[in-house]
C-alpha cells in the first residue's frame, strides 16, 4: 500500500504494532510511521491519537483501516476536516465510533467490501487492476515479495 499510494502522490503515514513492521513500512515508502500498542486503554488511545496528530498536524485526509477495534477511534480523532475513513476490515474487533466526531470533522466513514465490489462492478475492478499493473510495469513501484514457495508446496 505504501509504495502504491506514494506513486499516486500521497504522503503516507503507516501505523503498526511492532518496530519490525514499521521498518518494513519505511522500506516500502512510508513517509512517517507511528507505533501503536497491542493492548489499548483510554490513555493509550489518547496517546495514539496525539501521535497521529503530531505527524499530520492538519489531519489525515484518507484513513485506510484494516484493524478496527479500539484503534479506530484514535484514528478518527486524527482525521482532517472532510477526510474519508475507509473501513476495510476489523481484525481487532468491530469498532465503536462516537458519531459526533463525523459531525465535528465533517468527514465520511466508508465501508469498502472488495469482494462484493469486484462482483458488482467488474469493469471498474478490472480498470483498478490495470492501473496498478501499469504502475508496476512503468517502474513506479515494485511489489514486496516476502516469501516464495515451490509449486509443489501449493494446495
Where are these regions (language model features)?
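Helix-to-beta-strand junctions that scaffold the AdoMet/dcAdoMet cofactor pocket
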Residues: 79-80
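Glycine-centered, small-residue-biased loops immediately flanking beta-strands
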Residues: 83
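Rossmann-fold NAD(P)-binding glycine/threonine-rich loop
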Residues: 92-105
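Conserved small/polar residues in nucleotide/adenosyl-binding loops
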Residues: 1-3
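Conserved beta-strand positions in the Rossmann-like core of class I SAM-dependent methyltransferases
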Residues: 13, 86, 110
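C-terminal hydrophobic helical "lid"/dimerization subdomain
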Residues: 122-155
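Adenosine-nucleotide cofactor-binding segment
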Residues: 7-71, 124-127
Amino acid at each position: 500500500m505504501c509504495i502504491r499510494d506514494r506513486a499516486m502522490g500521497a504522503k503516507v503515514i503507516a501505523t503498526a504494532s511492532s518496530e519490525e513492521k514499521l521498518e518494513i513500512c519505511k522500506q516500502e515508502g512510508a513517509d512517517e510511521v507511528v507505533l501503536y500498542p497491542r493492548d489499548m486503554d483510554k490513555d493509550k488511545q489518547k496517546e495514539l491519537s496525539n501521535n497521529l496528530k503530531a505527524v499530520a498536524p492538519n489531519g489525515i485526509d484518507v484513513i485506510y483501516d484494516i484493524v478496527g477495534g479500539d484503534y479506530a477511534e484514535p484514528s478518527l480523532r486524527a482525521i482532517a476536516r472532510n477526510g474519508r475513513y475507509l473501513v476495510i476490515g476489523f481484525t481487532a474487533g468491530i469498532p465503536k465510533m462516537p458519531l459526533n466526531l463525523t459531525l465535528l470533522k465533517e468527514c465520511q466513514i466508508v465501508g469498502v467490501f472488495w469482494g462484493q465490489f469486484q462482483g458488482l462492478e467488474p469493469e471498474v475492478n478490472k480498470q483498478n487492476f490495470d492501473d496498478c499493473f501499469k504502475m508496476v510495469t512503468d517502474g513506479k513501484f515494485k511489489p514486496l515479495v516476502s516469501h516464495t514457495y515451490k509449486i509443489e508446496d501449493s494446495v
